[in-house]
Curated annotation (Swiss-Prot):
Keywords: Phosphoprotein, Ribonucleoprotein, Ribosomal protein. GO terms for cellular component: cytosolic ribosome; cytosolic small ribosomal subunit; nucleolus; plasma membrane; plasmodesma. One of its GO terms (molecular function) is mRNA binding. Ribosomal protein S6 is the major substrate of protein kinases in eukaryote ribosomes. Residues 220-233 have a biased composition (Basic and acidic residues). GO terms for biological process: translation. The modification Phosphoserine is found at residues 237, 247. The keyword Ribonucleoprotein applies. Belongs to the eukaryotic ribosomal protein eS6 family. This is Small ribosomal subunit protein eS6z. Component of the 40S small ribosomal subunit. Plays an important role in controlling cell growth and proliferation through the selective translation of particular classes of mRNA. InterPro entries: Ribosomal_eS6, Ribosomal_eS6-like.
Length: 250
C-alpha cells in the first residue's frame, strides 16, 4: 500500500510504499479522521501520530466520509458533494456513482495521511526541509485577519511581506504580489457614491415620466369623454327635432 504523507507545518509531502502486512494492520478498520500511531511502521516513525484523510482503492474509487463500510457502494450524488465532480450536468440532476466507504481495508492502494504530532526522528523530505507558501491571501479582509489589522490600517503595505521574486523567461529578475481584492479606497467610495447617485437619478426620472404619462392619459381620457358627450348631445338633438316635425299625410 502507498502512503501519501503530508506535513502541514513544513508544507512538504512524500509518498511511501509499505508492503509488510504486519505494519499495515495498525491502519486496518480505522476510519477517516481517526488518528493512528506511527510506531507500527518502524523505528523511524516512532512517536509520530498520523491522521487519516482519505484514500483510493486499486480501481481508483475514492473513500467518502460518512459511509460506514469497508467496501464499495453506489450512492445517488448531486453536484457539489465529495467524490462527484458533476461537470456538464443539468441543474439539480443526480447520478449514481461508486464510492468506497470511510473504513480502511486491505483493498486500498493509496492512503492519505497528515502528520499531527512529530516524533523523535526527522523524516527526510517531510520534516527536515521547509517549503514556504508561494502565495498569501488576496482578499483584503483575509489579509487583515492574517496580520491582525484594524479597519483603518492600510493593507497594501503588508502584501509586500509575501512578495515573490523569480526569474522570468527572458532571464530578468522580477517580483510579484497578489492584487488585493475588495480593497476600500477613496476611488472605490467615489464610484459607489456615483453609482448610488445615478440610481437615484434614474428612479426620479422614472417617477417623473410615470407622473407625466398619468397626466397625459387623464387628459386624453377627458378629451375622449368630452367628444363622446358632444356626439351623444348631437344625436339626441337630431332625434328630438325629427320627433317634433309633423307627419306629412297624403
Amino acid at each position: 500500500m502507498k502512503f501519501n504523507v503530508a506535513n502541514p507545518t513544513t508544507g512538504c509531502q512524500k509518498k511511501l510504499e509499505i508492503d509488510d502486512d504486519q505494519k499495515l494492520r495498525a491502519f486496518y478498520d480505522k476510519r477517516i479522521s481517526q488518528e493512528v500511531s506511527g510506531d507500527a511502521l518502524g523505528e523511524e516513525f516512532k512517536g509520530y501520530v498520523f491522521k487519516i484523510k482519505g484514500g483510493c482503492d486499486k480501481q481508483g474509487f475514492p473513500m467518502k466520509q460518512g459511509v460506514l463500510t469497508p467496501g464499495r457502494v453506489r450512492l445517488l450524488l448531486h453536484r457539489g458533494t465529495p467524490c462527484f465532480r458533476g461537470h456538464g450536468r443539468r441543474t439539480g440532476e443526480r447520478r449514481r456513482k461508486s464510492v468506497r466507504g470511510c473504513i480502511v481495508s486491505p483493498d486500498l492502494s493509496v492512503l492519505n495521511l497528515v502528520i499531527v504530532k512529530k516524533g523523535e526522528n526527522d523524516l527526510p523530505g517531510l520534516t527536515d526541509t521547509e517549503k514556504p507558501r508561494m502565495r498569501g491571501p488576496k482578499r483584503a479582509s483575509k489579509i487583515r485577519k492574517l496580520f491582525n489589522l484594524k479597519k483603518e490600517d492600510d493593507v497594501r503595505t503588508y502584501v509586500n511581506t509575501y512578495r515573490r521574486k523569480f526569474t522570468n523567461k527572458k532571464g530578468k529578475e522580477v517580483s510579484k504580489a497578489p492584487k488585493i481584492q475588495r480593497l476600500v479606497t477613496p476611488l472605490t467610495l467615489q464610484r459607489k457614491r456615483a453609482r448610488i447617485a445615478d440610481k437615484k437619478k434614474k428612479i426620479a426620472k422614472a417617477n417623473s415620466d410615470a407622473a407625466d404619462y398619468q397626466k397625459l392619459l387623464a387628459s386624453r381620457l377627458k378629451e375622449q369623454r368630452d367628444r363622446r358627450s358632444e356626439s351623444l348631445a348631437k344625436k339626441r338633438s337630431r332625434l328630438s327635432s325629427a320627433a317634433a316635425k309633423p307627419s306629412v299625410t297624403a
